Amino acid sequence: NWKKFWKPFKVDDKIIIKPTWEKLPEDTTEDTLVVELDPGTAFGTGMHHTTRLCITQMKKYLKEGQKLFDVGCGSGILSIIGLMLGAGEAMATDVDPNAVSAAIENARVNHINMNQYDVKAGDIITDVDFRHACGVEKYDLVLANILADVIIPLSGVIKDNMKPGALFVSSGIINTKEDDVREALLANG
């Protein structure tokens, strides 16, 4: 059972991710952002270094009240933390309906206001109607902690959802795909 090996851990000096079935470490301070999580079958426990990279970049660039788009949300960890850090609203999408269910449940556990959080199942790369239903020129920050083979085609369409001047943060790219991803991102602006 994988749950017995997953314990609370610090993402950085201010964020702790805690499995819903575990207790907080005794040294947790009042100013710590505690994120409770049960990924179920969805990807995203927060332990992977690519998730930590996205969280670090989100903390660096997200401004209070901004709109956040989490593409390939898995457990919802990135968008949930974004809302806890002050995003005004967040959209999270995944092609896996189980991930969407996990993200909604994790939002509930973390007392996220569902008027600020929308989670949908669908493919924004191939389904133009779905992509536009997620919001055209709406988001200040887009996060995609997914495989390079998804980021490459995503780079050609995600601008539809981004405000002018918005930032796109991606992670999950293996070294052998780094140049391909860079080329796609540069080619697609």
Where are these regions (language model features)?
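Surface-exposed loop/turn positions
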Residues: 13-15, 66, 166
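A short, charged helix-loop
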Residues: 29-39
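Conserved SAM/SAH cofactor-binding pocket of Class I
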Residues: 41, 45-123
